[in-house]
Amino acid sequence: MEIRKALLIFSVLLITMMTFVFCGQTSVQNKNQMVRLAKLVIDSTQLENYNALLKEEIEASVRVEPGVLTLYAVAEKNNPTHITILEIYADTVAYKSHILTPHFIKYKNGTKDMVKSLELVETVPLVPGMKIK
């Protein structure tokens, strides 16, 4: 009976400790995340080509870079040349690594004459750790 009691207490303590450890790691990871918006205006005569290069870059980044958590691009419904990209990186190291990848460099070089304006907006998540389903 005493052994059962001791095992039960040990199990509860172990589960409690694991919860604190894993929740703490998640909290630290979320605090280190780099989240920003890239707001672009694209030359209307090159929009189709731009969208193709953007799609290729986003798909490659999310597929091969573990530090790229989200790249979600949207165009304004009534103004499709105005594009906003939600960028979420594990941390600034992941971002710095991302901009040195061959697929990002190909995107930047391929679109430099298509982009009329680019604004990078640094943000602070209001609900840190929120996952996109």
Predicted segments, located by residue:
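N-terminal targeting signals for Sec/Tat export/insertion, comprising classic cleavable signal peptides
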Residues: V35-A60
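Solvent-exposed loop/turn segments at secondary-structure junctions
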Residues: T45, K77-N78, A90-A94, L126-P128
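Generic structural signal for individual residues within well-ordered alpha-helical segments
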Residues: L7, E48-N51, K96, I105
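Glycine-rich beta-strand-turn "strand-cap" elements at beta-sheet edges
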Residues: K5-L8, L14-V35, Y72-N79, K108-K133
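An amphipathic, aromatic/His-enriched active-site/gating alpha helix that lines ligand/cofactor pockets
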Residues: E57-T70, I88-E122
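Short, glycine- and small/hydrophobic-rich beta-strand elements in well-ordered beta-sheets
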Residues: G24, E59-T84
